Amino acid sequence: MITLIGTGHVFDLSAALLNIFEEKEPEIIGVELDPQRYQAIMLRNTDPTTYHAAKKNLPIIYKMLAQFQENMAEQYGVNAGDEMLTAINYAQSHQLPVAFIDTNAQQLFVHMWKIMPFSEKFKLLFSGVAGFFVSKKRVEQELKHYQENFDSYIQEIGKKFPTIKRTLIDERNEYMVLKLVSLHEKHQKIVACVGDGHVPGISALLQEKQIPFETIRLQELQKPHIQEMNGSSAHFSINYKPF
């Protein structure tokens, strides 16, 4: 069984995630990171000066996205990617293996930028600059729109930024599913933490491959009663696909 958890990289989800891990008792925990991004997050927390110096060599759009996430996470009192560190730290403290299930982010962004039409690059850069001035309230409004109208939201992204949708969403979904299928062949109980926007696509691909899974979405993680549970009696609204 794969438990697929939809997270948000700028929200404080630690308490909810720990409750789920205690409830599910996984044999292995997968995270939407590649080893290089994990090392970068650790460097950010242990040596900020070196981390910021290293960021100068990253692709420009990668840097813009990372900075936007860091700015928004700061408004929520966390660091971007803290939910992935929560998962990794839990695994390490319980002597569980960790699986990095995402593709190499830097290579992905270089490839995406190379194949992206100029018009899409221009729109993306403009949106990226505008993103630095987005308020917490606006992010929450967008999140509500996304949660209530996921299909139309993804369609909008596909129309405005087709290369981004194909590269950052669709192709990564396929890559992560291959990783999850490989884990499923070796482990009975798997918990995987991925960005919530990947959950529908990954779910559809797992269903095609007849892999049993359940999902816990970001909206559920953010409910106060989930955050406040002590882990002994956690219950979630779960979409279960038995085969």
Please name every model-derived segment.
Residues 1-243:
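Compositional signal for N-terminal targeting/processing segments
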